[in-house]
């Protein structure tokens, strides 16, 4: 991961999976005996950890399961703090059978507030535009309801476009809560609710428009390239997609001096 980031011109990585495992907490690299060594390795290589991704969702109709997800999120927050990462990512996510949208929204808001209130210093919880709350308005509404300054947003541009947002519209909505950005090109697939990640310029997510909006927001965080090979084995290998993204972004930039940082993501 670190060597790929260096090779392809990324300044940071977003931790999601390692050696095929999505359970970062079970990895020996992040265990107490090896954690300091792992942190030092990233620092020595000059690669920042910009976010620790969880699989946590807060949509369950069972209060006990939501409480369990809060517990898991907080465990990831402790890991992030020890690694010097400023964020953890959580999902909203899907309205469950028999549940209503408004009550699901309220459950999610309650859970992210509960996480935020117990976060270690220097780490925020960031809700991704994802699932049934992928539109900027839907995700931002949850952040407003949570009403906790440590609750932020991850703007997944492709997800919000797939949910019907324009990039300009979404940017206006997320700007006050924005902590992190996921960017990839993608296109709809017949018979699937999920858009397929594609190489830059082959889908419906305009990098040019995204960069223009990001500049207007005066955003100074990471733009994290998300390549979902783990879930979509048919797409190109990371060795193809990682340099394709950085080349596409850099070709669009007229003035690199105010460029947001580009981050590889382990997806």
Q: Can you name each region flagged by the protein language model?
A:
Residues 21-25, 58-63, 94-100, 162-164, ...:
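A short acidic, helix-capping loop that chelates divalent metal ions and anchors anionic groups
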Residues 1-11, 136-267:
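Histidine-acidic metal/acid-base catalytic patches
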Residues 14, 51-53, 89, 126, ...:
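Conserved beta-strand positions in the central sheet of alpha/beta enzyme cores
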Residues 24-29, 66, 195-200:
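Short glycine-enriched, charge-decorated loop/helix-capping segments at active-site entrances
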Residues 10, 15, 47, 80, ...:
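A structural motif
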Residues 10-29:
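N-terminal substrate-binding region of glycoside hydrolase catalytic domains
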Residues 16-18, 54-57, 93-95, 128-132, ...:
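Active-site beta-loop-alpha junctions enriched in small/polar residues
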Residues 2, 6, 35-37, 41-51, ...:
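Active-site acidic/histidine proton-transfer and metal-coordination neighborhood
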């Amino acid at each position: 991961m670190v060597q790929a980031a260096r090779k392809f011109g990324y300044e940071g990585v977003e931790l999601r999976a390692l050696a095929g495992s999505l359970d970062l907490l079970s990895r020996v690299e992040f265990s107490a005996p090896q954690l300091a060594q792992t942190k030092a390795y990233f620092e020595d290589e000059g690669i920042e950890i910009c976010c620790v991704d969880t699989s946590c969702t807060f949509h369950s109709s069972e209060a006990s399961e939501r409480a369990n997800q809060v517990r898991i999120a907080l465990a990831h927050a402790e890991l992030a703090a020890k690694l010097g990462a400023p964020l953890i990512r959580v999902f909203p996510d899907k309205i469950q059978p028999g549940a209503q949208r408004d009550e699901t929204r309220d459950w999610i808001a309650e859970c992210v507030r509960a996480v935020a209130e117990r976060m270690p210093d220097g780490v925020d919880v960031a809700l991704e535009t994802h699932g049934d709350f992928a539109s900027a308005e839907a995700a931002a509404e949850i952040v407003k309801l949570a009403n906790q300054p440590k609750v932020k947003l991850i703007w997944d541009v492709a997800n919000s476009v797939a949910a019907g947002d324009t990039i300009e519209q979404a940017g206006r909505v997320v700007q006050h809560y924005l902590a992190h950005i996921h960017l990839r090109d993608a296109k709809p697939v017949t018979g699937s609710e999920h858009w397929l990640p594609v190489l830059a310029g082959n889908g419906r997510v305009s990098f040019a428009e995204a960069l223009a909006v990001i500049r207007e927001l005066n955003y100074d965080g990471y733009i994290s390239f998300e390549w979902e090979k783990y879930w979509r084995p048919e797409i190109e290998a990371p060795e193809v997609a990682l340099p394709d993204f950085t080349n596409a972004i850099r070709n669009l930039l007229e003035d690199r001096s105010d460029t947001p940082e580009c981050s590889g993501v382990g997806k």
